Amino acid sequence: MVKSFQGVRMAEPKKAPIPQILVKEYMSTNLITFKPDDTIDQVMEVFSKRKISGAPVVDASGALIGIISEVDCLKEIIKGKYTNTPKFPGKVSEHMTTDVITLSPDLSIFDAASQFLEHKIRRFPVMKDGRLLGQISLSDIIRAFPTLRQTTW
């Protein structure tokens, strides 16, 4: 009795998973933060010296409560023009954004890039288990580009 011969079969090569490039690989972890009682004067001085455009606002326990940006500071500058104030005594708590969107450190850079496009903002705090781990900016995503070009998508 002869059994049918099916011939030589090649084993299908397993496709290697596409390596994920994650937010945690490109986020900044050495953050400059502000307190709600800091003045806009103080914020603008730090922004200018450190060449940054925004930073997280944290409470006494280090919990994220908002974001302060150059745009937020403009509100105080404009107010100062009308009151003829050379200093900007307004508090961070009066101008910060409190409805903060955060990203996970385990989110892919591609998904993070989509969030930048969707929300039209320049930075996201990175949080895990309610703890502020860092921040990722639009320029961090751009910095990841050479690595992104080497992946197959």
Protein language model annotation of sequence segments:
Residues 1-153:
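Tandem CBS (Cystathionine beta-synthase) repeat/Bateman regulatory domains
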